[in-house]
C-alpha cells in the first residue's frame, strides 16, 4: 500500500519499498528513493554519542529535505564549502550555525557569508587566506578561525591529503598569526573519505599535538573533520563507537584550553543510507547490463573510482542463481561504465528493475543532465537501507569477522 500526501501543488508519494513503487508506477526514468528514517537514525547517533559537536558536511548531499530531517534530529551546525551552500542552508534552516570550512574562498564569498548570513567560522591553511578573511570581514573581534593541518590519508579509501592543509613545519607561524586575528582559534584536518580504521584520527591528533606544542598557542576548537565511514559491499568498517572513543581519549590528552570544544564534520556517515535509486535494464549483452542511470547520474563513484554499491533485483520471477554483471549508463560516452561486479539473477533481462543502494552520499549530489539524460524524481520509502552502520546486526557482523581473522 502506498500513501498520497498533498502540500500545495506538490504531490508526495510514500511507498513501502522499491518493489511496491515499481509495481505502482512502472517508471521509465530513474527514481531516487528517500529514507528519512535512516537519516534521522544516523543524525541522532552522532548527536547522542559523538563526544562533541557534529557539523553536517553539506557537499555530501545538499537536499533541502535531508537538511530539514537532520535539523529536526538535532544537527544544528553545518559545514558549508561554497557561497551557494551558505545560501542554501541559510534559506532552508534560518537558525542553523554555518561554518565556512573550504580553505580557499573568494573575498566576495567571505564578505557575503559574514555580512549577510552571519557566518563567523572560517577555515584557512595559509597566511594569504588569513589576510583575505580579515580584510573581507573588516577585522572584527568575533571570528572563529580554524587552521587546517595536512595529515595522512593512509587509512582512507579516498585520499584528501594533497590539496589542502598546512604542513606541520609551517604551522607554527600560521597558528601564531591566526591566534592574533581570532576570537577563537581552532585546528582542523581531514583524514580522507571512508576512513577504515579509527587509528587514522590518532595519527592526525598526534600531529595536532605537535603543532600546538611548537606554536605555544591557546587552542579553543579541535575539529577532526570527516572521514567517518559507511558500509558497502567489501567494506565493513569498525563500529562508529570505536572511532568516537579513540577520538575522545586523544582529545582529552591534548594541551588545549580547559573549555576547548571538539567538533567533527560527518558527511557520508549521515547521508549514505538516506538514498537508493531504482533503475531499469534497457539491454543485456552477456554479462553487461545497459541501465538508465550511470556515471553522469547518481553512479559517479561506481564509474570513476570503482566504488561497489549493493544491488537487488526488484521482482519475484527471476532465477535464484546469481551472476556478476557490469553496468553501462545511458549516455553515448564509453566511460559511462561501472565495472562492479554487481551480483544479480542469472536470467535478468531488458525491462527488469534494479535497486542500487547506499547512494545518499555523493550520489544525487553529483548528478548532471549530460547528453539529455537524468531524472530528479524522488519518492519516499519506509523500508530499511540495504546496509547500515547503525544497527546492532551490522556492528555484530564486524566484530564476528574480526574474531575470525584474529584467530587464523
Protein language model annotation of sequence segments:
Residues 57, 125, 144-150, 188-190, ...:
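Short beta-strand segments
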Residues 66, 86-89, 109, 132, ...:
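Active-site-proximal flexible loops/turns
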Residues 246, 261-408:
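Charged (often Lys/Glu-rich) extended helix/loop segments that serve as interaction or gating elements
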Residues 91-93, 114-115, 137-140, 156, ...:
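Solvent-exposed alpha-helices and their adjacent loops that cap or buttress functional pockets
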Residues 39, 59, 82, 113, ...:
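Conserved, mostly hydrophobic/aromatic
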Residues 60-62, 84, 104-106, 126-128, ...:
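Active-site-proximal loop/turn and secondary-structure-junction residues that shape catalytic pockets
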Residues 1-142, 176-182, 214-218, 381-408:
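A charged N-terminal "starter" segment
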Residues 151-287, 371:
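Active-site loop/helix belt of alpha/beta enzymes
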Amino acid at each position: 500500500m502506498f500513501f498520497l500526501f498533498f502540500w500545495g501543488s506538490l504531490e508526495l508519494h510514500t511507498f513501502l519499498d522499491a518493489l511496491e513503487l515499481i509495481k505502482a508506477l512502472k517508471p521509465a526514468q530513474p527514481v531516487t528513493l528517500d529514507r528519512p528514517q535512516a537519516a534521522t537514525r544516523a543524525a541522532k547517533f552522532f548527536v547522542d554519542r559523538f563526544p562533541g559537536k557534529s557539523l553536517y558536511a553539506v557537499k555530501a548531499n545538499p537536499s533541502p529535505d535531508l537538511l530539514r530531517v537532520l535539523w529536526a534530529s538535532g544537527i544544528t551546525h553545518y559545514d558549508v564549502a561554497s557561497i551557494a551552500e551558505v545560501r542554501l542552508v541559510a534559506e532552508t534552516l534560518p537558525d542553523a550555525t554555518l561554518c565556512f570550512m573550504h580553505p580557499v574562498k573568494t573575498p566576495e564569498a567571505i564578505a557575503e557569508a559574514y555580512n549577510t548570513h552571519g557566518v563567523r567560522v572560517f577555515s584557512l591553511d595559509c597566511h594569504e587566506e588569513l589576510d583575505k578573511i580579515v580584510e573581507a570581514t573588516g577585522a572584527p573581534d568575533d571570528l572563529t578561525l580554524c587552521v587546517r593541518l595536512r595529515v595522512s590519508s593512509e587509512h582512507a579509501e579516498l585520499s584528501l591529503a594533497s590539496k589542502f592543509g598546512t604542513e606541520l613545519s609551517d604551522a607554527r607561524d600560521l597558528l601564531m598569526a591566526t591566534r592574533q586575528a581570532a576570537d577563537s582559534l581552532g585546528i582542523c584536518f581531514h583524514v580522507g573519505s571512508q576512513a577504515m580504521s579509527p587509528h587514522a584520527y590518532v595519527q592526525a591528533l598526534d600531529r595536532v599535538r605537535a603543532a600546538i606544542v611548537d606554536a605555544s598557542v591557546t587552542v579553543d576548537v579541535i575539529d577532526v573533520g570527516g572521514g567517518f565511514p559507511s558500509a558497502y559491499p567489501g567494506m565493513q568498517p569498525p563500529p562508529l563507537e570505536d572511532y568516537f572513543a579513540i577520538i575522545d581519549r586523544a582529545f582529552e590528552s591534548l594541551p588545549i584550553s580547559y573549555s576547548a570544544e571538539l567538533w567533527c564534520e560527518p558527511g557520508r556517515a549521515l547521508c549514505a543510507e538516506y538514498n537508493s535509486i531504482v533503475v531499469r535494464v534497457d539491454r543485456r549483452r552477456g554479462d553487461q547490463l545497459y541501465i538508465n542511470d550511470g556515471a553522469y547520474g547518481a553512479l559517479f563513484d561506481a564509474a570513476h573510482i570503482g566504488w561497489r554499491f549493493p544491488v537487488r533485483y526488484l521482482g519475484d520471477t527471476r532465477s535464484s542463481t546469481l551472476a556478476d554483471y557490469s553496468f553501462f549508463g545511458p549516455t553515448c560516452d564509453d566511460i559511462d561504465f561501472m565495472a562492479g561486479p554487481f551480483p544479480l539473477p542469472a536470467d535478468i533481462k531488458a525491462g527488469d528493475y534494479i535497486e542500487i543502494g547506499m547512494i545518499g552520499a555523493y550520489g544525487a549530489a553529483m548528478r548532471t543532465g549530460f547528453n539529455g539524460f537524468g531524472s530528479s524524481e524522488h519518492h519516499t520509502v519506509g523500508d530499511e537501507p540495504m546496509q547500515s552502520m547503525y544497527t546492532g546486526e551490522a556492528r555484530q557482523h564486524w566484530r564476528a569477522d574480526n574474531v575470525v581473522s584474529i584467530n587464523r
